[in-house]
Structures are given as structure tokens and as C-alpha cells.
Amino acid sequence: MPRPVLSVTAFCHRLGKRESKRSFMGNSSNSWSHASFPKLELGLGQRPSPPRESPTCSICLERLREPISLDCGHDFCIRCFSTHRIPGCELPCCPECRKICKQKKGLRSLGERMKLLPQRPLPPALQETCAVRAERLLLVRINASGGLILRMGAINRCLKHPLARDTPVCLLAVLGEQHSGKSFLLDHLLRGLPGLESGDSTRPRAEGSLPGIRWGANGLTRGIWMWSHPFLLGKEGKKVAVFLVDTGDVMSPELSRETRVKLCALTMMLSSYQILNTSQELKDTDLGYLEMFVHVAEVMGKHYGMVPIQHLDLLVRDSSHHNKSGQGHVGDILQKLSGKYPKVQELLLGKRARCYLLPAPERQWVNKGQASPGGNTEDDFSHHFRAYISDVLSTAPQHAKSRCQGYWSEGRAMARGDRRLLTGQQLAQEIKNLSGWMGKSGPSFSSPDEMAAQLHDLRKVEAAKKEFEEYVRQQDIATKRIFSALRVLPDTMRNLLSTQKDAILARHGVALLCKEREQTLEALEAELQAEAKAFMDSYTMRFCGHLAAVGGAVGAGLMGLAGGVVGAGMAAAALAAEAGMVAAGAAVGATGAAVVGGGVGAGLAATVGCMEKEEDERVQGGDREPLLQEE
């Protein structure tokens, strides 16, 4: 096939372009090929920089005009390609590589070019993060009868998120009655977290600036809710995963007292920074709930080794005392209490709680930011409210969920960084342990003191089980060897276990506090008895096996000794017949002894010796037969 002829102008133009590129970029083995596309980096980091050069035509080396692309990968202007196309050729021939290929109008799509690039898979953490959509999840549901249903799947989805699984967590929980503005507060906290996480701004963004990120307000607030996506805040190397938690209607008077106590316990486990949101004034119901919550938190903290109240904000909205400082308002509250709520007084006198007073908002500001008659929408409420949101979000990383000091002597697992800080995975395990206790069909409780008594008894029961398990393990180790096991008969071992069981029940039973002490002891005794029976079954089989092995070895030795003595006597009697025959019998007997044991060998030697003696007597008597017989 003849080569197409390039015009002099096109050839000089092309040569000049290539020579200028050589002088600027240096020699290249592929300098005559068309300019390649810029490399695309796949990832989730910064956006790729724009290409330095636009795609050029392989003929005129100019920017492509009305481009076409061939299957071989070369791109041309439609005018240049038509000029240099070989006439009479049905399929177009590429002027660059001389291959016959199909013609496509326009450049190859970006997807086709990306398929040619080496694909780098994303890290597993980023893959899981991108695959999960952030939303509000129900963690604790209250059914129609008032019972609680803990959804461990939702809890694991939140706390075992790739960004929170091995990271200290801060759970920012908003408490308060229904229709007290909790959803409004949560919505602004949620819209302020992404900007603070990215470092763009520490102020909450305007309404509608973050589509899809909104807490929302509806009537389905029964239970405890959590935003599924954590936000990483704090300095580099000390990041904390911050979650938002809505306690729903845990303060509802319609719930039973036992349900409210359990909800307080779960709220304590699912929060490290609490905000008690109330309107106008702190009412007696608010203080009563706060007293119960602090009491339950202390009980749970003592049992699980966690700090009961790490930080608590009293947020009073629509306050008529907005000109007074929060500390001054706390002083007024303490004067009114007069010893009625001792735990609340102790909390307010310390440094773990603070009070914020917010004035009533203007109606125009509440109605989606419409301007006030004076034209000033930044009223006192919005100014103080935005300042409070910024303060909460900036200090949240300082209040990650943590354990009490000195609790690590019990051998708990160590967290990353500060070993007192709980990671998301560790907190999920603690909540699972709590749900296991709450799910047991035990006596009910209607006060924090009764709950404390049950947790105390639970701790004693677990200690008794561990003590008995350790005793059984020591007995198992001590009787592993044959002769150690044979010293302790099964009946003796059964008596040892029974004595130890009775001693443990007597020692730990005295320390039980609940009224149902007898039922608890009966259940504990049944569990210990079942464990003892399981060990005795395996121990009896082991003892019988050891005894059979030792008996077989001793029996074989005794039988071999007796057979040897008898065989020696018979061989001595056979010596009177013929020394050669006896020697042969002894040799056969020795071989038999080597194969089947001393007893069988000795017996075989004696038998052969007797047979040879009888044959010798028969020959001497004249009863001789020919070696060969004829018919």
C-alpha cells in the first residue's frame, strides 16, 4: 500500500514542532509519537491539577479541532485526517502507525482512558467509609409495654466505624424534655461539625449549606438515637471521634421508674459530654431527673470503672435572667435546693458542670432567618447561641470517654495514646456486657440504690465463678501426669470439688445485698455444680485410661517373668535328651520372645524342647520311617 504524501508545508511545520520539543525536553526514544494524555491520579485527596497541554493532532500538532479517534489510539483533526487519508481505502488507515482501523468521531471517553491506567484500590477504612451513608440511627428502642430493646447492630455500626474503631470517642449527648428545642440544638451542632473537622470554620454553617446533613425533628423520638458518622476533631496524632446522641424522651414521666433508671444507665454509657437543655428555668422535674442521672452514673462508674460525669452543661434557654452570669444563676439554684438534691449540689459546686443562660430569640430570627423590622437579624440570642455552639465543639475533644484512675490494675485492655481513654470498639464491648446483665430475667429495680445492689451481687457472683474455675483449672493441671492422677481417686476428687464449692458459696453468699439472696445462691450453686460435673466426667475417663495403661504394663511384666521361669525349667529338663535339639528350641524360643514378648517366647521354647525330646525317644525305639515313600 503506497504511503501518503505530506505537503511541504505540513512536513516543515511538523519538523519544526518536533525539533523545538527536542531542544526543550531533550532526546526521547518516542519523540515522534503523539503527545500523551496527562496522568490521572486516582484517590480521595486533593483534586488533580489541570493538564498542562491540551490534546493535539498527530499531523498538525495543533489543538484538536473537530477531533476524531481511531481504534489504534491516535487522535486527529477531521480536516487533517481527510487530507492525508488514502483514497480508495474502505477502512481508514492511520497516518501515524499505518494500521487499518475503525473511525470514531470525537475523543475517547474519559472512562476508556482511565481503564488503561493502573487501578489502585482504596484502603479498607476508606472503602467502608464511602460505602456507608451517614444517618440518624436508633440505638435503644422503647416498645409499647415500656420495655427496652438494645440494638447492638446499630451500636456496632456507629462505634465500630472505621474512623472510631481504634480511636478515642467523645459522645456529645443532649438531654431534656420533649419539645424543649433539642432537635434545634442538635441540628446546629451537626451542621457545625463538618466545618470544624475540615478546618474551614469553627462556626456553624448557614441553613441549607450542607444538604443531607440535618438532624431533623419528628415525633419518633422514643429511645436513644445517634448520628452514625463520627467527626474527627483535635490535633494531629490526638484525634477524637465525636458522635452526636439524642436521648429522646428518657425524661418522660409516662415511663416507669425502672425504665427511666435503665435509660439513665444506658445514657451514661453512651455519653461523655452531657447538655441538659431546658427552657426558661430549671424546674423541679429537671433537678429530680438530674439527681437520678448523677446517682445512676456514679453507680455505673463504680461498677465499670468509668468517670461518672466528665462534663455537664446546663443550658437554660429563654431565660429572664440573661443579664446574669451562669455562675450567679447556679448560686441562686443552690440556695433554693437547701439540701433537697445533694448529688446535684455536689456536682454544681465542682468544676465538672457549668451553666449557660440564653435570652429569648426574636420571632423574625426563628422564622428561617427573616429580617426583623429594624433590619438586624443578629439579635442577642443568635450571638450567644453561635458562641455557645462554637465553644462546645471546640472543647468536645477534651472530654473523650475515659476510665477512672487506678482502674487498670484489674487487667483491662489498653487504649491507644492515653490508656484511660476508651476507643469505640472497647465502649461497644462494655455496652454489650451491660446489655447482657439487663437482659437477664432477674429481680426488677426501681431506684439507683436497688440497681447498685444488683450490680454488687453480680460482681460477687462473677468473682465466685472465677474462683471456682481457677480451682478446677489447678486440679486439672495437677492431675495431668499418670502417677499424679492415680494418687487421687475419682471419689476423692469429687469430695474436694464439693468442699471447695460449699466454701465459696458460704464466703460470697454473706456479701450479697439483694432481697432475693436465696434465689441468687441457688442459681450460683447450680452453675458451680454443672461445672464440677463436667470436670468429673473428663477426670473419670482420664483416671480409667491411666489405670488401664499402668495395669497393662505391670501385667505384661509379671507374665513375662513367670513364662521365663517356666521355660527355663522345661529347657533344663530337655538337656538330658540332646544338646543340639535343646539349642534349636532355645533359639526358636528366643525369636518368639523377641516377637511376642517374654512370656510367649519362654512358653514356645519349652514346647519345642518337649517335642524334640519325644521325637528322639521315638527314633531310638526303632519306629523309623523312610525319607521318601513310593505309591
UniProtKB/Swiss-Prot annotation:
Gene name as annotated: Rnf112
EC number(s) given by UniProt: 2.3.2.27
Keyword annotations from UniProtKB, A to Z: Cell projection, Cytoplasm, Cytoplasmic vesicle, Endosome, GTP-binding, Membrane, Metal-binding, Neurogenesis, Nucleotide-binding, Nucleus, Synapse, Transferase, Transmembrane, Transmembrane helix, Ubl conjugation, Ubl conjugation pathway, Zinc, Zinc-finger
Distribution of this protein across tissues and organs: Predominantly expressed in brain.
Function: E3 ubiquitin-protein ligase that plays an important role in neuronal differentiation, including neurogenesis and gliogenesis, during brain development. During embryonic development initiates neuronal differentiation by inducing cell cycle arrest at the G0/G1 phase through up-regulation of cell-cycle regulatory proteins. Plays a role not only in the fetal period during the development of the nervous system, but also in the adult brain, where it is involved in the maintenance of neural functions and protection of the nervous tissue cells from oxidative stress-induced damage.
One Pfam family cited in the UniProt record for this chain: zf-C3HC4
Pathway per the UniProt entry: Protein modification; protein ubiquitination
One GO term (biological process): protein autoubiquitination
Name of this protein: RING finger protein 112
Topology of this chain in the membrane: Multi-pass membrane protein; Peripheral membrane protein
Family according to the record: Belongs to the TRAFAC class dynamin-like GTPase superfamily. GB1/RHD3 GTPase family. GB1 subfamily.
Gene Ontology CC, one term: synaptic vesicle
Native source species: Rattus norvegicus
Domain of life: Eukaryota
Transmembrane segments: 547-567, 580-600
Keyword Calcium annotated: no
Binding residues for GTP: R317, D318
Stretches annotated zinc finger (RING-type): 57-98
